[in-house]
Curated annotation (Swiss-Prot):
It comes from the Eukaryota. This is Homeobox protein MSX-1. PROSITE patterns: HOMEOBOX_1, HOMEOBOX_2. Disulfide bonds: none annotated. Its main location: nucleus. Interacts with CREBBP/CBP, TBP and SP1; interaction with these transcription activators may inhibit autoinactivation. Interacts (via C-terminus) with PIAS1 (via N-terminus); the interaction is required for the localization of both proteins to the nuclear periphery and specific binding of MSX1 to the core enhancer region in target gene promoters. Interacts with H1-5. The lineage of its organism: Eukaryota, Metazoa, Chordata, Craniata, Vertebrata.
Length: 297
C-alpha cells in the first residue's frame, strides 16, 4: 500500500501493476487525478474572508475609521449574497443591494440604531412635538402616577373680634351730656348711689350708663397719669457722660471738683487747643454717676 502526498491512499490491487517495469507511472497518474478533483471541489465553494463580514470586528471598526466603509460593507454583503452563504444584514433596505446608484436617504440607519434593530420607518421615530397638545403615555394619565392638581388657596378670612350675641349697643351720648359728665367727674370721681340716681335723672340717662361711663373715665385718667409720671422720670435723669478713665465720683465731692478743674486746665494748655467738656454746677445733682444707659428726650 502506498500513501500519496495529498492524503489519498491507493491500493495496488485497485490500480494493478502494469507489466514491463511501469509500476511508478500508475500512482503518479492517480495522484494527479485526485488533485484535480480536489481543486474542482474547492473552486465550487468560494472562500469568504471573515474580515468582510458585516458583523465582524473589522467591519464595525471600519465604519468609524474610514468615510467609505459603508460602501465597502455593502459591496461585501452583495458578494456574500451572491455566494448564498449569508443573510441580509440589518439596517439595509431590501432594494438597496440591487441598485447601488439609487438615491438614498441623507443619513442611513446604522446597524445598532433603534430603526435598524426594530425595523421602523424614520417618520415613526421622529414625532412633531406640539406645545399645545403634549402627548402623554397611558401610565402618566392614570391618577395613580399623575400628581394631584394644585389646590387654589383661598384668601384667609378676616378674623374679627366676636362680640357677645346679647351685647347691648353703645350709648350715643350727646354733647351736652358729655360736658355735664366731664364737669361732674372733675368735681368728684366716685359718686354715691343717691348722687348717681339724681345725676342720671337730670341727664335723662340710666344709673347703669352713668356708672359705666365713670368707670371708663377713671381708667382713662389712670393711664394718662402713668404716662405723665413716665415723662417726668425721663426728664429728671441727668444727661452727663460717664467719668473719665472709668472712675465715678459723686457730684459735689472734692474728687469730682478736682477732676473737672484738671480737665479744664488740660483743655486750655498745649499747642493744640481742645474743647473742654462743660462742667455741671456742683451740688445741682447728687446722684451717683456710673456706667448706665442715658435716655435722650
Amino acid at each position: 500500500m502506498t500513501s500519496l502526498p495529498l492524503g489519498v491512499k491507493v491500493e495496488d490491487s485497485a490500480f494493478g501493476k502494469p507489466a514491463g517495469g511501469g509500476s511508478g507511472q500508475a500512482p503518479s497518474a492517480a495522484a494527479a487525478t485526485a488533485a484535480a478533483m480536489g481543486a474542482d471541489e474547492e473552486g465550487a465553494k468560494p472562500k469568504v474572508s471573515p474580515s468582510l463580514l458585516p458583523f465582524s470586528v473589522e467591519a464595525l471598526m471600519a465604519d468609524h475609521r474610514k468615510p467609505g466603509a459603508k460602501e465597502s460593507s455593502l459591496a461585501a454583503s452583495e458578494s456574500a449574497q451572491a455566494a448564498g452563504g449569508l443573510t441580509q444584514p440589518l439596517g439595509v433596505p431590501p432594494g438597496s443591494l440591487g441598485a447601488p446608484d439609487a438615491p438614498s436617504s441623507p443619513r442611513p440607519l446604522g446597524h445598532f440604531s433603534v430603526g435598524g434593530l426594530l425595523k421602523l420607518p424614520e417618520d415613526a421615530l421622529v414625532k412633531a412635538e406640539s406645545p399645545e397638545k403634549p402627548e402623554r403615555t397611558p401610565w402618566m394619565q392614570s391618577p395613580r402616577f399623575s400628581p394631584p392638581p394644585a389646590r387654589r388657596l383661598s384668601p384667609p378670612a378676616c378674623t374679627l373680634r366676636k362680640h357677645k350675641t346679647n351685647r347691648k349697643p353703645r350709648t350715643p351720648f350727646t354733647t351736652a351730656q358729655l360736658l355735664a359728665l366731664e364737669r361732674k367727674f372733675r368735681q368728684k370721681q366716685y359718686l354715691s348711689i343717691a348722687e348717681r340716681a339724681e345725676f342720671s335723672s337730670s341727664l335723662s340717662l340710666t344709673e347703669t350708663q352713668v356708672k359705666i361711663w365713670f368707670q371708663n373715665r377713671r381708667a382713662k385718667a389712670k393711664r394718662l397719669q402713668e404716662a405723665e409720671l413716665e415723662k417726668l422720670k425721663m426728664a429728671a435723669k441727668p444727661m452727663l457722660p460717664p467719668a473719665a478713665f472709668g472712675l465715678s465720683f459723686p457730684l459735689g465731692s472734692p474728687a469730682a471738683v478736682a477732676a473737672a478743674a484738671g480737665a479744664s486746665l488740660y483743655g486750655a494748655s498745649g499747642p493744640f487747643q481742645r474743647a473742654a467738656l462743660p462742667v455741671a454746677p456742683v451740688g445741682l445733682y447728687t446722684a451717683h454717676v456710673g456706667y448706665s444707659m442715658y435716655h435722650l428726650t
